[in-house]
Each structure stands twice: as structure tokens, then as C-alpha cells.
């Protein structure tokens, strides 16, 4: 453990508190900080000691002479926020959900349904117990859950040919063929994850609820998409106040099987690593207006590629009418746009192409103030910090493989 030296930081406070032993207790506590606008720079959780909490605190006070401002995993925390350096590090925060999970708000459609709440706890337990490298447990969905899925699947599939982007429509039949996408069947995350890995290297990881923007985007840097496994309440199949398996599998998954879109999504994730908090908010806004609610030009048409649109029958129709305002996607302008969460978007941003958007995100990422650049090493599934000559040599060696590409092109000419 590292204790930072005495500094003059203002408004910084360290605190220790205990929680009841129940699923969702941490999420409840963190929600209080969020409601009061308090920024948490570091969180650690430990199993409760056998001694009373007061005794533990008294012991710490006796041993530590200076005021403790923050604890970090290493000295780099003094200058930049911590970020995962390898794919196993995702285990450290995957269960730090901010809302929902098995705990539902009073206005949630399933709040008064004890059967639904018990079912949500089953899904939450799967996510909480999952660790990288394990197979995602298979789930036997109930007939009621399949009926809800079937309603959403049937309605959306009728719109995809005329409203979804070409990349989505190209992949969707493949998901039906290889991953069990059917009106009467809810596909399994493990099957889909393996298929995505064979297409683009992306994989799914079960999550109990909403992660912070920083944690969620960090997963994308490793080509990991944190996916819910539960389904919306059956009383209103066409509405959900949170991401569910319909949103993940019908909206997100098809595009993660497209190489260009997969690279675009990873670029947003890489840009978030070590970024200051204010830039995380900006990147989250870019993500919202692209990966979630993006439109793109395809020939003379405008099509949807955002998962929030591709999983919402009503908004998918609305977005391609003359009711909303359409603007060209420019990250510097997009980050300034406010957006509603519980209603249709009044403004959408239109991309020229995934490649064009990827380059624009790269250029914007270069403006983020951080003392180094990063790259993802797909062989070791780790993040390389490019801050020394050896790392630059390694990068140069990988670039040298472009010669193989040039040679292949010459032989094909």
C-alpha cells in the first residue's frame, strides 16, 4: 500500500465506512456521493475485520502521523488516474456498478414484482462471480422472458432492412445462423462472445448493472463489452429504463462483429485511459452520440448504427423522420451537446463513415492532456504506455510488418 506524502490539496477527504452484507449495498452508498456531486478519486473494498470498525480506525490513527489524502496502486496515480494495464485488471472494477443490478428504483416496471426481482438477483450473482478467462454461464430463460424477447425481436427485425446500416444488416443473418438469434430463443452470451472473438477480437463480459463511464470505456480499450444478461420486465416489452439483453444483443453485438466499427469503438476506449475526469465526460458524450445513437451516410440514405436506436422500435422510426435535427459528426462540437436520457433525442449526429469517425476520434484523442500515448498489444492483451525508448522500439518493430502488406499487394497487382 502506498500512502501519498502530505500535500496541499484542498477539498480532498479520505473516509472509511462499513456496509451491510448484501448485494447492491455498495451501489446504494455510491449513489449518495453521486447525488451530492462528490467526485471519488479512489475506492477500495475489503472484507470486514474481526475487530470493531472503531478499533481499526483508532489503530490507523495511532500509526499514521500525517493526513491521508488518497491511496493508489502505484506512484503514477499522483499525475494521472489509474487505468487497467492488462485484461485481467477488468476484474478489479467490473462489479462496481452505479445503479440497478438486483436493486431496482421505485419507478422501475419490475419494482413490485417479487419474481422479477428474484430473477434479477440470479443474474447479478452470475456477474459478481465471473472472472476473466472463465466461460460465461449459460442461462435457461423462462417462457415469459422468451416471450418478451420475441416481441422485441419481431418488431425490430421488420425495420432493420430499411432503417439499419449495411454493416448491421450484413451481420444479423450470420448471428441467426451461428449464435441462435431467433424469435423464440434468447441467445447465450458465451456463444456470442466466441463468435465475436472470431470476427474482430471483441468479447462479452457479464455485468450486473451500469458501470461508471470511465470503467465502461476502459473495457472497450481491451475490446471487451460489458453486457447485461437480464431482460426487461414483460409488462412493457417496448420500454426499458436501463440496458438489458435486448439492447445489448440486438443493438450492440451486430456492429461489434464489423472490423471497422470494432476499431472505432476501441479508439474511444483507448482515448479514455488516463484521461482527466472532465475529458471522460466528453468522451462519454461522444460515445452516446455515436455507439448509442449514431446515424451514418450510406449512399443517398441515412441509416442508424447506434445501439440505442437499433434496439428501440419507436426511436428507430422517429430518428429517420424530419422531426429531429441532424448535424455532422465533429467530436469538438459533439462533446458540447446535452442530451436527454429518458426520451427521444432531439439531435442526432451523422457520420460520413466509420473510418471517417475513427480518424476524427483519433485526432480528438491527441488533444487530451496526458503525459504519454498508449497502444493496445493484442498478443499480450495489455496496454503499452509509450513513454520510453524500448516501448517505441517495440512499436517500430510492429510497424515494420507493413512491409509484408506491401509485398502481398505487389504480388496481387
Predicted feature locations:
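Non-catalytic, well-ordered alpha-helical scaffold segments
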Residues: 27, 190, 194, 244-247, ...
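The feature captures two recurrent sequence modes
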Residues: 66-256, 351-413
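Short coil/turn segments at secondary-structure boundaries
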Residues: 206-211, 260-264, 278, 301
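Intein-associated homing endonuclease modules of the LAGLIDADG/DOD-type, together
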Residues: 32, 144, 148, 292-294
Amino acid at each position: 500500500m502506498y500512502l501519498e506524502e502530505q500535500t496541499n490539496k484542498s477539498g480532498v477527504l479520505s473516509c472509511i465506512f462499513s456496509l451491510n452484507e448484501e448485494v447492491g449495498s455498495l451501489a446504494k452508498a455510491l449513489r449518495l456521493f453521486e447525488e451530492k456531486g462528490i467526485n471519488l478519486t479512489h475506492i477500495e473494498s475489503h472484507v470486514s475485520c474481526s475487530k470493531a470498525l472503531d478499533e481499526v480506525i483508532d489503530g490507523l490513527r495511532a500509526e499514521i502521523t500525517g493526513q491521508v489524502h488518497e491511496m493508489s496502486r502505484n506512484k503514477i496515480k499522483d499525475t494521472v488516474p489509474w487505468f487497467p494495464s492488462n485484461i485481467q485488471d477488468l476484474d478489479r472494477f467490473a462489479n462496481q456498478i452505479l445503479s440497478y443490478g438486483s436493486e431496482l428504483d421505485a419507478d422501475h416496471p419490475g419494482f413490485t414484482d417479487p419474481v422479477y426481482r428474484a430473477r434479477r438477483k440470479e443474474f447479478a450473482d452470475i456477474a459478481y462471480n465471473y472472472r476473466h478467462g472463465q466461460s460465461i454461464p449459460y442461462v435457461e430463460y423462462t417462457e415469459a422472458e422468451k416471450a418478451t424477447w420475441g416481441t422485441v425481436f419481431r418488431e425490430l427485425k421488420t425495420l432493420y432492412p430499411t432503417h439499419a446500416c449495411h454493416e448491421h444488416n450484413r451481420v444479423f443473418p450470420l448471428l441467426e445462423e451461428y449464435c441462435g438469434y431467433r424469435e423464440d430463443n434468447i441467445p447465450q452470451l458465451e456463444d456470442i462472445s466466441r463468435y465475436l472473438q472470431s470476427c474482430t477480437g471483441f468479447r462479452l463480459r457479464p455485468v450486473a448493472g451500469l458501470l461508471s463511464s470511465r470503467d465502461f470505456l476502459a473495457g472497450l480499450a481491451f475490446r471487451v463489452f460489458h453486457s447485461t444478461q437480464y431482460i426487461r420486465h414483460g409488462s412493457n416489452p417496448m420500454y426499458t429504463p436501463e440496458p438489458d439483453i435486448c439492447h445489448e444483443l440486438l443493438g450492440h453485438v451486430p456492429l461489434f462483429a464489423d472490423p471497422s466499427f470494432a476499431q472505432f469503438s476501441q479508439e474511444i476506449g483507448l482515448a479514455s485511459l488516463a484521461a482527466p475526469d472532465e475529458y471522460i465526460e466528453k468522451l462519454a458524450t461522444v460515445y452516446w452520440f455515436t455507439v448509442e445513437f449514431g446515424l451514418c451516410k450510406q449512399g443517398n440514405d441515412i441509416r442508424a448504427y447506434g445501439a440505442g436506436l437499433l434496439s428501440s422500435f419507436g426511436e428507430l422510426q422517429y430518428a429517420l423522420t424530419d422531426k429531429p435535427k441532424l448535424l455532422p459528426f465533429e467530436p469538438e462540437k459533439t462533446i458540447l451537446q446535452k442530451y436527454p436520457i429518458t426520451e427521444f433525442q432531439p439531435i442526432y449526429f451523422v457520420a460520413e463513415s466509420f473510418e471517417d469517425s475513427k480518424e476524427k476520434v483519433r485526432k480528438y484523442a491527441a488533444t487530451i492532456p496526458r503525459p504519454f500515448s498508449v497502444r493496445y498489444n493484442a498478443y499480450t492483451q495489455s496496454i503499452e504506455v509509450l513513454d520510453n525508448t524500448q516501448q517505441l522500439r517495440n512499436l517500430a518493430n510492429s510497424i515494420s510488418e507493413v512491409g509484408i502488406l506491401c509485398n502481398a499487394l505487389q504480388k496481387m497487382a
